[in-house]
Amino acid sequence: MPLSRDPGALLSRSYELPSGPRVRLRLARPTDLPGIRMLLAERGLPATEIGLERLVRYEPRRRAVICATAPLDGTEAVVGVGAIELEPDAGPDILVVDEHVTDGLGPLLADVLVQRARIHTRRIA
C-alpha cells in the first residue's frame, strides 16, 4: 500500500484493514499508558513501569512511537504500538499489535514507522 510522503499525513487519517475495525495511527502520549499496558498484558509480554514510561516519553527528534487505536466496546482502545529510532535504514524496535482484532495492522504500522524515519532523516540531511 503506497503511503503519503508527508509524515503528518500518515497520522491524520484512519486506515481500513482486511478485517476488523478501522484504525487511527497517532503519536503515543502519556495518557496511552493504561492502553499500552493492557495490550502488552493481553499479548503476554512483560513490561516494567519505567519501560512503559520511557516508551511514551520519548525525544521526538530522535525517536517515533506510534499508537494504533480502534473503537472497541464503546471506547477508543489501543490495539497496537510501535517504535523506531529516527535514523537512516532503521527498522521498528518495538511492534506489538492485537492481531485477534486487527488483521493486517502489523505490516501497516511497520511501514508507517519506517517511512516516518526515512522522511525525518531526509529533512535533517
Give residue spans per PLM region.
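Short aromatic/hydrophobic contact patches that present stacked aromatics
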Residues: R22-R24, G91-L95, A125
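A short beta-loop-alpha structural element at the N-terminal edge
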Residues: V23-I36
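Conserved GNAT acetyl-CoA-binding A-motif
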Residues: R116-A125
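Acetyl-CoA-dependent GNAT
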Residues: P46-D93, D98-E99
